[in-house]
A protein has these predicted regions:
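Catalytic cores of carbohydrate-active enzymes across secretory and cytosolic contexts
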Residues: 1-506
Length: 506
């Protein structure tokens, strides 16, 4: 991991959130998602202060009791950090998270808008939410980061994701020499996807990001798109001979390093008794072939179109009726946002329609499980013959990296060309266009009928790649990129050099 550094992590969600248990005893629940796992591993090797939003009433109690200061926290991986909760004004946070971040920025960056009707920035109150929610919440994060920097002036400030595009500029204005790093965990689309948002927003986003010393993306594709949009939106200049741009007198190096997983942590989860119990049920009820998808109920995951593809597959191959099912383990996501709630209803309707058309005694084509159950998902990882990942766009997609390491059937990965993971794993998977239903149906059949030796070779290649390019590789690489940028500048092939450009569009 190199030398021990002081790092101030800044993210919307923190590593834990607190609830009251029996007799109102405070109980910590680990924060969800791969981001928490990735950032939490930093605390194992570095001196970490973590700034995050208070997500529960108990979190807010802790923030008040601590006077807004950081408190010592033991993370799930056994490492220690200082955790500072920010208790935001509820109305401002609602506008920040439920109007601007989701759906506006999420939909723009995943190219999800129905452009005939959306976005309607006036009726949605987007500009009001930007000014009264997103901007002040970012200012609160920046103020907290500056306070922590005053105690640890040599620390790296590590901003994360699309919730915090404005904070770096606010920190830079008052701490010109600070070391600032930001990683964008979702896709960075082409310029036309940004043009659907008001100019005030797109200019501020690009200006904020360019206050960092290094901005990281999962892929060269997303990085290339950022270079193009930064040049167009704020007039940034490409630095000759480097993978960097300059803006108002400051150079920002641009890194392309795909986040990854901790294979040891996944192996421990695979052996969990709760996973084995779910796996026992799957083995007892599964047909000859099992197609598995594991996703959040997010429109970007393309679940409804995936069910249409499975329906077409069944139309084309009646000989496989009763012999194949699709297990869909879906984690409910952002159901307080109308677009997400509507999408869950669409998922349920589509699964019901396909099942009513094809099911017969003892066979249900689509086994739809909508619940937050990581143990069921990992059991699905172990048992798939084909893993189906057809996201419209996805910054990376960690399922594509996790599942092959857990799988016990030499399963085949079917992977959307618009996922960040495709830049790494494309040679070892069946590539699909996420908008082409026939291509997806054909890929399911090809996966289930692939020669055994090819299946073994492909999944072995994925495992080797992921184990070599694991979470430690990602973290070490980002810190190296920052140190290199601050010391020597950034050469074209020095940042994320092991990843190759696959696409220049999207």
């Amino acid at each position: 991991m190199g030398k021990r550094r002081e790092i101030i992590i800044v993210s919307n969600r923190g590593p834990v959130t607190y609830q009251h248990g029996l007799e109102r005893v405070r109980e910590a629940k680990r924060g969800g998602g791969g981001l928490v796992t990735a950032l939490g591993s930093l605390a194992t090797h570095h001196d970490v202060t973590w700034i995050a939003s208070a997500m529960s009433d108990v979190d807010r109690e802790i923030a008040e009791e601590s006077g807004g200061q950081a408190v010592e926290e033991r993370l799930a991986n056994g490492s220690d950090c200082r955790l500072r909760f920010l208790a935001h004004e509820p109305s401002a946070y609602d506008q920040y998270y439920n109007v601007v971040a989701n759906p506006a920025l999420w939909f723009a960056q995943h190219c999800l808008w129905n452009l005939i009707r959306e976005p309607d920035c006036e009726r949605s109150g987007l500009m009001q939410a930007w000014r009264e929610g997103y901007a002040p919440i970012n200012a609160a994060f920046a103020e907290a980061a500056l306070e922590e920097l005053s105690r640890r002036p040599e620390a790296i400030v590590f901003f994360n994701d699309y919730h915090l595009y404005l904070a770096p500029r606010l920190v830079r204005a008052r701490a010109p020499e600070a070391s600032l790093l930001q990683f964008v965990h979702i896709p960075w689309p082409q310029l036309h996807c940004w043009r659907v948002l008001p100019e005030e927003i797109t200019v501020a986003i690009h200006d904020g990001l360019l206050a960092n010393d290094v901005v990281g993306f999962h892929t060269t594709r997303w990085r290339s798109n950022f270079i193009q949009s930064a040049q167009s939106v704020v007039g940034a200049k490409r630095v000759s001979g480097e993978t960097a741009v300059s803006h108002i007198g400051r150079k920002t190096c641009l890194s392309a390093r795909a986040i990854s997983i901790d294979p040891d942590e996944l192996a421990a989860l695979v052996d969990d008794p709760r996973v084995r119990e779910h796996e026992r049920r799957i083995v007892e009820t599964r047909p000859e072939y099992l197609v598995v998808r594991v996703d959040r109920t997010d429109p970007s995951k393309n679940i409804v179109r995936g069910f249409c593809a499975f329906e077409l597959f069944l139309e084309l191959h009646p000989e496989l009726h009763g012999r194949v099912s699709m297990l869909s383990c879906l984690d409910p996501s952002r159901l307080n946002i109308p677009e997400y709630e509507d999408y869950v209803e669409s998922i349920q309707r589509e699964a019901l329609r396909v099942n009513e058309r094809f099911q017969r005694s003892g066979w249900t084509p689509i086994d739809l499980q909508i619940e937050d159950d990581v143990h069921q998902s990992v059991a699905g990882y172990k048992q798939y013959d084909a893993l189906f990942v057809n996201a419209v766009y996805d910054g990376l997609n960690l399922v594509a990296k996790e599942a092959p390491l857990a799988n016990e059937r030499d399963g085949v990965l079917i992977l959307s060309e618009n996922t960040g993971a495709h830049e790494e794993l494309g040679p070892f998977s069946l590539t699909i266009d996420p908008f082409d239903i026939r291509a997806q149906a054909d890929a399911i059949y090809e996966a289930l009928t692939m020669r055994a030796d090819v299946r073994r070779r492909w999944i072995g290649d994925i495992r080797s790649w992921v184990r070599e390019h694991d979470l430690a590789w990602w973290i070490n690489g980002l810190l190296h990129d920052l140190e290199s940028c601050l010391a020597n500048g950034c050469e074209p092939d020095a940042l994320g050099e092991e990843q190759k450009t696959v696409h220049d569009d999207g």
